[in-house]
Amino acid sequence: MAFNGIALLITATIFIGSCYANYCDSSLCRQGPHVACNAPQQFGPACGNNRKFVPMDSKLKTIILNTHNKLRAEIANGKHGFPQAARMPTLVWDDELAHIASFNARKCIFAHDKCRNTRQFKFSGQNLAITTFYGFNFQAGDRAENFTQEWFNEHKDCPKSYVDAYPSSHRGPQIGHFTQLVNDRTWKVGCSMMHYITNGKMINYYLVCNYTMTNMIGEPIYTKGRTGSKCETGQNPQFKGLCSPRERVKSESYNG
């Protein structure tokens, strides 16, 4: 089994008949074209003929959210040698972010898009992961949970000093998926997942998760302080250390 995980930014396109924004609006993207602008609705050639979206039903959403929040709570409570977080929100699901993620996922190419912003979230971030295997009966929920844990495991290589200021450059193993996962200006996530067959027998799962905030160079990953001390809506009784699901934070740069 081969595993690859990666994190970055992504965003997407318009729902037919919905009130979502025009993703071709140049004001949404400074860094390049929006992934959802005039995006094709069909699957990409790399997906082959045997491909499908994994249904993002309530069970799979719950697995993704619970895994994210369990791991965020570990950092908020000061585990793994990291300082406690004063205001780490509970992640909740966002359908627009998930829809936008589908435009990356449907390409079946493991690569970040250049822009995935929405009207509300102008600094949207992204994590990607893919696995290819043969001869195993892995389920989508198991893969999603494993992917999220692999992102989090990058904490082993992340210097604690990065909590105060995300670096402009980093030498060594990847740490960006972990820092994206525990960013305290992120409070929503939406994901899309593809299942496709290559070379006649190789099974692939490709997961794309979009977040309300990305890593910002020179800015804190999260604000240090006594666990939950700055939560404005109290703490989450299920994921102790996180702010309640009602907590709303500004997903924007400190520098405007």
Curated annotation (Swiss-Prot):
<protein>
    <recommendedName>
        <fullName>Venom allergen-1</fullName>
    </recommendedName>
</protein>
<dbReference type="InterPro" id="IPR001283">
    <property type="entry name" value="CRISP-related"/>
</dbReference>
<dbReference type="InterPro" id="IPR034763">
    <property type="entry name" value="P14a_insect"/>
</dbReference>
<keyword id="KW-0732">Signal</keyword>
<keyword id="KW-0964">Secreted</keyword>
<dbReference type="InterPro" id="IPR035940">
    <property type="entry name" value="CAP_sf"/>
</dbReference>
<comment type="function">
    <text>Activates autophagy in human monocytic cells, dendritic cells and macrophages.</text>
</comment>
<comment type="function">
    <text>(Microbial infection) Promotes Zika virus replication in human dendritic cells and macrophages. Facilitates Zika virus transmission from infected mosquitoes to the host in mouse model.</text>
</comment>
<comment type="similarity">
    <text>Belongs to the CRISP family.</text>
</comment>
<dbReference type="InterPro" id="IPR014044">
    <property type="entry name" value="CAP_dom"/>
</dbReference>
<dbReference type="GO" id="GO:0005576">
    <property type="term" value="C:extracellular region"/>
</dbReference>
<feature type="signal peptide">
    <location>
        <begin position="1"/>
        <end position="21"/>
    </location>
</feature>
<feature type="domain" description="SCP">
    <location>
        <begin position="65"/>
        <end position="211"/>
    </location>
</feature>
<keyword id="KW-0325">Glycoprotein</keyword>
<dbReference type="Pfam" id="PF00188">
    <property type="entry name" value="CAP"/>
</dbReference>
<feature type="glycosylation site" description="N-linked (GlcNAc...) asparagine">
    <location>
        <position position="146"/>
    </location>
</feature>
<feature type="glycosylation site" description="N-linked (GlcNAc...) asparagine">
    <location>
        <position position="210"/>
    </location>
</feature>
